[in-house]
Amino acid sequence: MQQPIIGVGHSMGGCQIATLSVTSRRIFSTMILLDPAIGPPEMGLATLGLGQLTLRRRTQWLTREDAEKALRTSFSTWDPQVLDLLIKHSIHSDKQSVEMEDGPFSLVTGRYQELVNYIKPSFIRSGKVVGQELVHQTGPVDMYHMLGLVTCSTLYLCGGESTLSTPRARELWLSRTAELSYPKDPGEMRKVDERIVPDTGHFLPMEEPKECADIIADWIDKDECMIWNCHIGKQGKIWRDLSNTNRKMNAEVWMKYLQSKL
């Protein structure tokens, strides 16, 4: 894929973007993680009670109006346009044929799809639907232990009132990200920073989408694009513009130079 590629992810998506940056090193020129689900074992999924909340959450209503009212109540802090989009795309009719009445209505994404983000569906392999040991997904904790392996500039964008990106969590993210100090390419600048959006919670991109977009654009435009255009992209263009003959000549000169160093 042609660079630059910028990774942006929220919550579990932030964890997945960060994981991809480690497993496919240098795939991203930079990444922006919005309130990512990344933390040590004492801050892992087993401690948050998300599975219990998911199983208790209502997912079906008799009418579309009832479903819309429930969503508008649950997500009342969201930006109105974002909330309208959620309602438009997250509710569907359960009717089995055109002869049936419109209702009932359910969420497009059911409990199971959400639950397996938090708890491993071990019954799929064992065939036993009861009596299985409860095993939580370990992705957020795994990524926490891999933060030192990150090699691209990283911005943590956090909600000021979020219960996930607490001051302690942000301190750990900033201190551990890219801490192993892998050798840098010429011109490479590896930054780690944070920005806080006041009066927002974990759903900050849905609550204040414009402010989040402005912060992300500022990070990309003022810093990352300049670095790319002035250094990394320019160096890559020099190599791409060389003929195969000149590339081979450069490689031979480089290997001869290495003989005096190794």
Curated annotation (Swiss-Prot):
Say if the entry is tagged with keyword Hydrolase: yes
Alphabetized, the UniProt keywords read:
Hydrolase, Peroxisome, Virulence
Q: Which SUPFAM superfamilies match?
A: alpha/beta-Hydrolases
The record's section on InterPro entries has: AB_hydrolase_1, AB_hydrolase_fold
> One cellular component GO annotation, for this chain's record?
peroxisome
Which pathway does the record list? Mycotoxin biosynthesis
Functionally, this protein is described as follows: Abhydrolase domain-containing protein; part of the gene clusters that mediate the biosynthesis of the host-selective toxins (HSTs) ACT-toxins responsible for brown spot of tangerine disease by the tangerine pathotype which affects tangerines and mandarins. ACT-toxins consist of three moieties, 9,10-epoxy-8-hydroxy-9-methyl-decatrienoic acid (EDA), valine and a polyketide. ACT-toxin I is toxic to both citrus and pear; toxin II the 5''-deoxy derivative of ACT-toxin I, is highly toxic to pear and slightly toxic to citrus.
Where the record places motif Peroxisomal targeting signal type 1 is 260-262
TM regions (residue ranges): none
Any further remarks? Gene clusters encoding host-selective toxins (HSTs) are localized on conditionally dispensable chromosomes (CDCs), also called supernumerary chromosomes, where they are present in multiple copies. The CDCs are not essential for saprophytic growth but controls host-selective pathogenicity. Although conventional disruption of ACTT2 could not be accomplished due to the high number of the copies identified in the genome, the high sequence identity among these copies of ACTT2 is likely an advantage for RNA silencing, because it allows knockdown of all copies of this gene simultaneously.
What's the Enzyme Commission number for this chain? 3.1.1.-
- An example Pfam family from this entry, by short name, is Abhydrolase_6
> What turns on this gene?
Expression is positively regulated by CSN5 during infection.
Question: Phenotype on deletion?
Answer: Abolishes the production of ACT-toxin and impairs the formation of lesions on leaves sprayed with conidia. Does not affect growth rate of cultures, sporulation, and spore germination.
Species per Swiss-Prot/TrEMBL record: Alternaria alternata (Alternaria rot fungus)
What protein is this chain from?
A: Abhydrolase domain-containing protein ACTT2
Molecular function in Gene Ontology: hydrolase activity
Q: What top-level class of enzyme does the UniProt entry assign?
A: hydrolase
Lineage: superkingdom: Eukaryota
Q: Which family does it belong to?
A: Belongs to the AB hydrolase superfamily. AKT2 hydrolase family.
Localisation per UniProt entry: Peroxisome
